[in-house]
Amino acid sequence: MTLSSTKVPEGWQGSEAAYMAFGALVRAGKEPRRDFSYAPRMEGGTVDFTFTNPPDLAMQVQESFYSHHSGIETRGTDMLAKAQLAGRGITLIMLEHDKLIQDPDWLIGEALRYRDHSWE
């Protein structure tokens, strides 16, 4: 599945890349509202995906512009968000847009194993 072959349903409140991540989570056996939630409000902003199964995981989609134009300040903000969530026992995995659209099932599988491939 690629971004160009993905049809985002009307009413989806998020990016196409986030919808691809959502679909990959479902294909990985995760059930919405039971295992994970999309776009909940968390302290300090919004994290795209939080989980009840496993409860110590969160994922954030980094959109294309963000991925290509991030500098040290943006990475510092990401590291701060990761540290804040880590203080609550939650691992935040960043999902880079380009990697997500190339192979969403692989990237989500890696994220579910707590493997963060951002900034590689």
Model-identified regions with their sequence ranges:
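Nucleic-acid endo/exonuclease domains
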Residues: M1-E120
